[in-house]
Amino acid sequence: YLSHPNMQTPKSGKIYSCNEGAFNSFPEPVKQYINHCKDNNYSGRYIGSFVADFHRNLFKGGIFLYPQTKKDKQGKLRLMYECNPLAFIAEQSGGMATDGINRIMEITPTHIHQRVPLFIGSEEMVSKAKMFIEAYEAEQPQEEVNQTSKA
């Protein structure tokens, strides 16, 4: 039973959802993207429930991001049973889901509890976050890029 048949996620939105309490431990390009959101008067909405935050952004347009941090260097959310199911829903409704670079649905798991960073929601917003990450990595010497992707 679908509550909203043929649902489509807006291509863009004005909501970003992330735990800003961890802002200081986010990679630099993620900080830049969040500052971009603030500079453009996007609304920060984060209640700490992945499914609830994703659901709101699915209907209203927005991005949910849970990047890697200094503490969780590979990300915190599990690929197989947290990221993949919602990435499937996002893509089926016209949205997008990446680990910052790679499409979530194309990541081959290395183990059942594998953790990954997640950027999921409206296509234009996820693409913009990905652009910030790619631009930052392109500017860095190769050894720093390797540290950034692991930090």
Regions found by a protein language model. Name each.
Residues 1-151:
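IMPase-like, lithium-sensitive Mg2+-dependent phosphomonoesterase catalytic core
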